[in-house]
């Protein structure tokens, strides 16, 4: 669990209310934000792991886009483009069940192969919504995926997600495949 308090002080130049209002007419340079995240992971059966995650942001201010809580993407709400939506405050939840390592069923091809099922969601809120925009947009998806490695240095992640609740550019029923690769030297 982590929680942090962030305060922005007006220092002039580009860090001024005048500059901030060029992107958001209700924004002020003198704002504060509370951000928190928590995660829990538990082995529920031999080889099976359940993981829950929560991220949150709270403020009473109308923020510029770079300070807003963003949702959508491979490490947020799968099934959506990266940061498909952002707002002044919000929460993101994820629940993922990872199965046992089944790599031995494929000979020596994989060092590790585990399948996952997941549900992701986010709720956001604008403190001063712009005319025509949703006051409290929300995203939700579910899906399946795999975590595999050919060696300890090369890790792959593949997730296929279906949108349950979306935004106009990615509505209910939309499907997206996320693929990531990580390597270490």
Model-found features: residue ranges?
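Short basic/hydrophobic patches in alpha-helices and adjacent helix-turn junctions
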Residues: 96-100, 144-149
């Amino acid at each position: 669990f982590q929680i942090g308090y962030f305060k922005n002080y007006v220092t002039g130049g580009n860090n001024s209310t005048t500059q901030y209002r060029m992107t958001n007419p209700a924004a002020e340079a003198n704002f504060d934000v509370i951000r928190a995240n928590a995660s829990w992971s538990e082995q529920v059966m031999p080889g099976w792991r359940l993981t829950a995650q929560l991220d949150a942001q709270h403020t009473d201010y109308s923020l510029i886009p770079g300070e807003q809580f963003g949702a959508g993407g491979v490490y947020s709400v799968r099934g959506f483009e990266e940061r498909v939506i952002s707002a002044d405050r919000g929460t993101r939840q994820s629940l993922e069940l990872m199965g046992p390592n089944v790599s031995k069923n494929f000979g020596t091809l994989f060092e590790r192969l585990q399948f996952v099922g997941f549900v992701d969601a986010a709720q956001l809120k604008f403190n001063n919504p712009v005319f025509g925009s949703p006051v409290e947009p929300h995203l939700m998806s579910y899906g399946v995926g795999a975590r595999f490695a050919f060696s300890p240095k090369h890790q792959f992640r593949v997730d296929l997600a279906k949108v349950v609740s979306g935004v106009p550019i990615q509505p209910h029923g939309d499907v997206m495949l996320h693929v990531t690769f990580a390597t270490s030297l």
